[in-house]
């Protein structure tokens, strides 16, 4: 048998997450694993199982999900990327297929992951191409959110940010970096990294959290998109969405940035704000050795 490593992208809007739901009543919910495995099994000539780096929830997207699968040696000459993509629906795509070491494991060999979360800072309307891919929050105090994010970065017990339904032995995780990034339509500049200086962009409106006043700006009078990036050695169940829910609560003024350490110290999920919607979250990248991941031990 030979092991393949697949890099996968998908739009999660109409998907019930990664993992096949074998015990669900028929018709089974549509999942990424449930779509891919029958295709790969037919091509391999036998039943196969895909193992992913992370089991994304229903509605969550991916630009860089990684999975491994074992196939017969005599199937190595197949153009797996082309052949799988020819059979996939429009919301799932294989970005890369390569042979991996026989002991490679998509989940256990990962050095870290990067998730991104997209916010849309108005509720007046969402451009059609962003439907199901952003959380429309309305205006936010992004500078208060910056201050709150400083408390989340680093090594902490994140029990207050873990939802039920997991069997992990430890809730201590390291968030290496939290970045407030420019989207493709925003000025460059915003960066917040744990332990490093950062800068923030400003809009040209009357208030830094309002849409730009410049008539030629592509978002003038409409709203702003903010993209937050979270890098860490691993994340608990819905941890990124729970951190994003906290940051938005701070941005709305429901909490102060200085409330964050106290909430974390309780280790109590009920003390933290509600989970952010799945629609804004994307698994953007999974890091493996050898690579230039700056936080690798």
Curated annotation (Swiss-Prot):
The keyword Transmembrane does not apply. It comes from the Bacteria. The active site is at 57 (nucleophile). It catalyses: uridine(38/39/40) in tRNA = pseudouridine(38/39/40) in tRNA. Keywords: Isomerase, tRNA processing. The keyword tRNA processing applies. Substrate binds at residue 115. One of its GO terms (molecular function) is tRNA pseudouridine(38-40) synthase activity. One of its GO terms (biological process) is tRNA pseudouridine synthesis. Its EC number is 5.4.99.12. Disulfide bonds: none annotated. InterPro entries: PsdUridine_synth_cat_dom_sf, PsdUridine_synth_TruA, PsdUridine_synth_TruA_a/b_dom, PsdUridine_synth_TruA_C, TruA/RsuA/RluB/E/F_N. Transmembrane segments: none annotated. PANTHER family: PSEUDOURIDYLATE SYNTHASE (PTHR11142), TRNA PSEUDOURIDINE SYNTHASE-LIKE 1 (PTHR11142:SF0). Formation of pseudouridine at positions 38, 39 and 40 in the anticodon stem and loop of transfer RNAs. Belongs to the tRNA pseudouridine synthase TruA family. Homodimer. This is tRNA pseudouridine synthase A. It comes from Nitratidesulfovibrio vulgaris (strain DP4).
């Amino acid at each position: 048998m030979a092991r393949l490593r697949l890099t996968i992208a998908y739009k999660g809007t109409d998907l019930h997450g990664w993992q096949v739901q074998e015990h669900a009543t028929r018709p089974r919910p549509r999942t990424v694993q449930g779509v891919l495995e029958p295709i790969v099994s037919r091509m391999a000539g036998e039943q196969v199982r895909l193992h992913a780096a992370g089991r994304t929830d229903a509605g969550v997207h991916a630009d860089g999900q990684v999975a491994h699968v074992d196939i017969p040696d005599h199937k190595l000459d197949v153009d797996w990327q082309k052949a799988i993509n020819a059979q996939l629906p429009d919301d799932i795509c294989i970005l890369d297929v390569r042979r991996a070491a026989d002991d490679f494991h998509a989940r256990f060999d990962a050095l870290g992951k990067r998730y991104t979360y997209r916010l849309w800072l108005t509720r007046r309307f969402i451009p059609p191409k962003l439907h199901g891919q952003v959380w429309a929050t309305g205006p936010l105090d992004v500078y208060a959110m910056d201050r709150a994010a400083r408390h989340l970065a680093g090594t902490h017990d994140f029990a207050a940010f873990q939802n039920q339904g997991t069997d992990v032995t430890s809730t201590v995780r390291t968030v290496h970096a939290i970045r407030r990034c420019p989207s493709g339509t925003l000025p460059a500049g915003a960066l917040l990294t744990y332990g490093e200086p950062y800068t923030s962009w400003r809009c040209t409106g009357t208030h830094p959290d309002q849409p730009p006043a410049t008539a030629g700006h592509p978002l003038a009078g409409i709203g702003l998109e903010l993209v937050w990036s979270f890098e860490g050695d691993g994340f608990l169940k819905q941890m990124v969405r729970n951190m994003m829910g906290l940051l938005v609560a701070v941005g709305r003024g429901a909490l102060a940035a200085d409330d964050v350490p106290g909430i974390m110290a309780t280790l109590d999920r009920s003390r933290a704000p509600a989970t952010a919607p799945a629609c804004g979250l994307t698994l953007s990248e999974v890091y493996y050795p050898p690579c230039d991941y700056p936080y690798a031990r």
